[in-house]
C-alpha cells in the first residue's frame, strides 16, 4: 500500500516530470486552513484522541454514508440515536466492520486521505483488511497514547500556519479563549456561522433569534436583530475571525427597503413562517451580511445548494450531518443579482462562492467571478473535493475566471488527520494540471511555479486575510 510518489500525476513521462518539479516546489509549504470543522476543544484541552474508530470512522460522514448505503446501520458504527436505542460502544468492533468493508472505498478520495494518514502519521503501509484489522487497530491505539499524537503536536507536525473553525453566532468561543490564554503559538480562529438565527424555515428559528439578541443585549426588533449580528461579529473578530460562512439552501438574495425588511422580520419571528417568507428572509440576510462585511472586513463565504437531511428517517433518529445531504441544482446569475446590484462593484467586499452544482462552474460562476470585483470562486467543495472534482473545476473555470479569481484550497473537514492528506491531494492535482499546460506550450514553466505556489498557499492567505 506504500504511497506512490507519482500519485495523481500524468502517466505521460514528460508531463509527469514537469509535475514532479512543480510539486517539489510546493510540497513543504505551510498549510493554510481557512475553512473547516475541527473542534476548538481539541486545541484548547490538547487531550489524546480516544481510539481509532472515534478518530477515523464515527465523525467522518464520508465513511459512515458509504457504509450505510451498503446496509450497515448507523448504530453499528457507534452513532448515537436520539431515541435512546443502543448503539455500538466497542471501538474494536466498529473498526472491524470498517476494515471488513474497506473495499467499498476503492477509487474514492476517502481512500486517498486514509492511506495518506496511515503512512505519514502512523507509519503503516499495509492495506486495511479484515485480516489485519486488529493489528492495525492496536498499532494506532498505541500511538494515540503518545505525546506526539496530541492535537497541538499534530498541528506542528502538519505544518499548519492557521486553521479556522466554524462556530454558531451565539457560541461563547470559550475554547478559542482558552487557546489564547494558554500562550500556545497555534493560530486557531473562529468563523461566524449565523445560519441557525437566519434560517426562518427552521423550527427553532425564533428561539435562536431570542438567544442571539439575549447574548448581544439588543431588543427583539429588526434593528435590534441586525445590531446583535454586528455585536457578535465584532466578538468573533476580537478572537481572530476573518470570515463569515452562510450555508443556505439557495443563493437567493434580496434588497428590500428598511420598512419591508422590518415587516418581514415581524412576520417570521412569530414562527410558522411561510416557505416564501423564509426564503425571502434568508435572501435579505445575505445582503445584510454583505453590508456588514463592507463595514467590518469579514470575508463572506456562501455555501448554497445542499438539500439538507434528505432522508427524514435518518434525521429524526440521528440528527444533522449524518451523510444524508444531497447536492441540488443551484442558480447564481439571477439569484445573486440583488446583492451584486447593491455591492458587487465594491472592492471592500469579498464574497467567496461555492457550489454543489458543477454545471454552474462555466455557465455562471466563472463569468460572474471573472467580472465582479467583490466575487471570488471557492474551491471544489464537498462531493467534488476529489482528484477528478478538482481537475474538473480547473478545466471549467480557468478559461473565464483565471487563477486569480479563485482562492486556493479549503480542506473543509471534521477529520483532523485528513488535513495534510487533502492539501497534498490538491497540490498534486493542481501541479498535474499546470504541468499539462506547460507540456501543451500554453504556460511557461517559470509561470507554473508561481501559480502552483499561489494555489497552494498565497491565495488562501491573501483572500482570507490570514
UniProtKB/Swiss-Prot annotation:
The reply on keyword Isomerase is yes
What Pfam families has UniProt attached to this entry? UxaC
Among InterPro entries, the record links this protein to:
Metal_Hydrolase, Uronate_isomerase
**Protein family:** Belongs to the metallo-dependent hydrolases superfamily. Uronate isomerase family.
Query: What's the protein name?
Result: Uronate isomerase
Question: GO biological process annotations for this chain's record?
Answer: D-galacturonate catabolic process; D-glucuronate catabolic process
What SUPFAM superfamilies would the database entry show? Metallo-dependent hydrolases (SSF51556)
Keyword entries, A-Z: Isomerase
Organism of this sequence: Brucella canis (strain ATCC 23365 / NCTC 10854 / RM-666)
Give the EC number.
5.3.1.12
